[in-house]
């Protein structure tokens, strides 16, 4: 008989600890869909806005709105103010056409003549140019005449009938228009400055001012 060999028929024991560890390491660390949930949570957290940020945004919006409203009202106010100034200046400063070399002021034409003549001659010179000697009718509208420094014949004379002072057109002198400084012999008047006139002998030669209404 042949010899019987003793074989160890016990099932072989495999060291499965390392194999199991490999398998566990190969398994996914999260459940299916968990990564998507995490990403969504991160996005939601990013979308969260702090209350301080909201307050800053509101303050900025209110500031911009207030600035826009303020600028709008300021523009309206400036426009109205400019229109008012233009209308007033246009009305007061309007002056129609005047002859060459004449001064136009408040719708009247003025000419200063440097030649010396008696009052009657000065009056005739103005009449030849469709004008009359200077008449003061409003300090406000003839304000530029206060700057005149020399003496000029004007259209003011003393009436021989009653001794009153009248303009060429027959109207009486108003003390609110002109201050008249009288001398014993003068029956005509020269304009000085600052709305003051001085009586003088009508035969004395003086320069004169002609005046007429602008067309």
Swiss-Prot record:
Matches recorded under PROSITE patterns: C_TYPE_LECTIN_2
Compartments where located: Cell membrane
Gene Ontology process terms (BP): adaptive immune response; cell differentiation; cellular response to lipopolysaccharide; defense response to Gram-positive bacterium; natural killer cell activation; natural killer cell mediated cytotoxicity; negative regulation of natural killer cell chemotaxis; nitric oxide biosynthetic process
Cytoplasmic side: 1-51
Stretches for region Disordered: 14-35
Molecular-function annotations in GO: carbohydrate binding; identical protein binding; MHC class I protein binding; MHC class Ib receptor activity; signaling receptor activity
Tissue and organ distribution: Expressed by natural killer cells and by resting thoracic duct CD4+ and CD8+ T-cells, but not by thymocytes or other hemopoietic cells. Expressed by DC cells.
This protein's record includes keyword Chloroplast: no
Residues linked to a glycan: 120, 130, 162
Family annotation (InterPro entries): C-type_lectin-like (IPR001304), C-type_lectin-like/link_sf (IPR016186), CTDL_fold (IPR016187), NKG2D (IPR042169), NKR-like_CTLD (IPR033992)
Membrane topology classification: Single-pass type II membrane protein
Entry annotated with the keyword Transmembrane helix: yes
Limits of the C-type lectin domain: 105-211
Keyword vocabulary terms for this entry: Adaptive immunity, Cell membrane, Differentiation, Disulfide bond, Glycoprotein, Immunity, Innate immunity, Lectin, Membrane, Receptor, Signal-anchor, Transmembrane, Transmembrane helix
Cellular component terms per the entry's GO annotation: cell surface; external side of plasma membrane; plasma membrane
Spans within the Extracellular topological domain: 75-215
Transmembrane segments: 52-74
Superkingdom to which the source organism belongs: Eukaryota
S-S pairs: 95-104, 98-109, 126-210, 188-202
Function per UniProt: Functions as an activating and costimulatory receptor involved in immunosurveillance upon binding to various cellular stress-inducible ligands displayed at the surface of autologous tumor cells and virus-infected cells. Provides both stimulatory and costimulatory innate immune responses on activated killer (NK) cells, leading to cytotoxic activity. Acts as a costimulatory receptor for T-cell receptor (TCR) in CD8(+) T-cell-mediated adaptive immune responses by amplifying T-cell activation. Stimulates perforin-mediated elimination of ligand-expressing tumor cells.
Subunit and partners: Homodimer; disulfide-linked. Heterohexamer composed of two subunits of KLRK1 and four subunits of HCST/DAP10. Interacts (via transmembrane domain) with HCST/DAP10 (via transmembrane domain); the interaction is required for KLRK1 NK cell surface and induces NK cell-mediated cytotoxicity. Can form disulfide-bonded heterodimer with CD94. Interacts with CEACAM1; recruits PTPN6 that dephosphorylates VAV1.
Other remarks on this protein: Is not capable of signal transduction by itself, but operates through the adapter protein HCST.
Name this polypeptide is given: NKG2-D type II integral membrane protein
Species, as recorded: Rattus norvegicus
